[in-house]
Amino acid sequence: MSIRYESVENLLTLIKDKKIKPSDVVKDIYDAIEETDPTIKSFLALDKENAIKKAQELDELQAKDQMDGKLFGIPMGIKDNIITNGLETTCASKMLEGFVPIYESTVMEKLHKENAVLIGKLNMDEFAMGGSTETSYFKKTVNPFDHKAVPGGSSGGSAAAVAAGLVPFSLGSDTGGSIRQPAAYCGVVGMKPTYGRVSRFGLVAFASSLDQIGPLTRNVKDNAIVLEAISGADVNDSTSAPVDDVDFTSEIGKDIKGLKVALPKEYLGEGVADDVKEAVQNAVETLKSLGAVVEEVSLPNTKFGIPSYYVIASSEASSNLSRFDGIRYGYHSKEAHSLEELYKMSRSEGFGKEVKRRIFLGTFALSSGYYDAYYKKSQKVRTLIKNDFDKVFENYDVVVGPTAPTTAFNLGEEIDDPLTMYANDLLTTPVNLAGLPGISVPCGQSNGRPIGLQFIGKPFDEKTLYRVAYQYETQYNLHDVYEKL
């Protein structure tokens, strides 16, 4: 197998044993990008000069047996809404085209400390608003399994690059499913950690009470290794949680005999495709064969997740994106002749259609006379959804179900139908609304397109999610499939 498809864990061993140099790994990755990414279109910017320089410095440390860092010499790709000092960060928007940050996000500081090597920035839906990566101002990423299909979104570039062997791991952000859904569509592993597990400092805000950074990898253990590296409280993020336990790997191989798994009947109900239902039901049988106890439960407020999410997320986006006005931040219209025109034209020209749609929706929901009817009511529904999960977790360790109701749809199929696009978030948005951790792992294919299985856990219990996902992965994985892509 080419180095480009090696796991994080195997690469770490090869580097530690001096069977390969970090500079060789980085060269192989850039060769793969040059060969494959003109088709996949996952990267927006490459940091080749700095990456090669960093890898050569790591070569010298390797020669001296000074290989410090959990990710020593491991290449990484970063979603383009995560601030990278000195490297363009655009959120895939005309509004931020050419913006080069002068500070580092906390997750990037942590990854640099662990001696990972930044390869480049990855494509996404504009300002993380979308489920297909088609709202990007710059390019449309394709699904490595089927180039006619979308990779999902908003972290579509992050999922596609990992699936195509262009990086062993990437970071994405998840506000309503934006790590897990593309992970499902692209046949990789994607973790949305508990809200507060990972610092949001340096993540360009979409919806501050929902956003969370997480890793995408080709296997479960790699994912746990990366989350260990980026987790932890941060003085720069008041919503980050002071939780000391960031060990996700030591018990990952422990069996799941007796583990209680809840299967909500709503997760296999209306709107979920038959091929997805079949794959999930097969996965449930696999869990039972591994000794888990799987029982049907009800999460009755699941159906309100999408409307509640879109009101809350759009309202927060309306506020967060007000800073992009052409004066303090972002694109500056050259055609304006007055201050009022400057505000209007900069935002009208700088933002894409979907971003403007959500700003309008959020502004409306927060406006006088509608706040109580929409925003306040949505927050009440959010509490009901959280209460549903709390009740289930009194008796169960993990919730299981599909990640997305269908496999990846075709490029261009849903971009002009926002309500159909939003419906794809049916099974992921409740997890964000409740602030819970959720992981997507591959569980099947239909017509060559991957199907994702989602495990949802108790707050800050990513350890159990990794354990059950790892055990399931021993029975089903796509390791041999990636290289054929």
Curated annotation (Swiss-Prot):
Quaternary structure note: Heterotrimer of A, B and C subunits.
Cellular component, GO, one term: glutamyl-tRNA(Gln) amidotransferase complex
Active site: 79, 154, 178
HAMAP family (UniProt xref): GatA
Name this polypeptide is given: Glutamyl-tRNA(Gln) amidotransferase subunit A
InterPro entries found in the cross-reference section: Amidase, Amidase_CS, Amidase_dom, AS_sf, GatA
Catalyzed reactions: L-glutamyl-tRNA(Gln) + L-glutamine + ATP + H2O = L-glutaminyl-tRNA(Gln) + L-glutamate + ADP + phosphate + H(+)
Domain of life: Bacteria
Pfam families linked: Amidase
Function: Allows the formation of correctly charged Gln-tRNA(Gln) through the transamidation of misacylated Glu-tRNA(Gln) in organisms which lack glutaminyl-tRNA synthetase. The reaction takes place in the presence of glutamine and ATP through an activated gamma-phospho-Glu-tRNA(Gln).
Protein family according to the UniProt entry: Belongs to the amidase family. GatA subfamily.
Gene3D superfamilies linked: Amidase signature (AS) domain
Organism: Staphylococcus aureus (strain JH9)
Its EC number(s): 6.3.5.7
One annotated GO biological process: translation
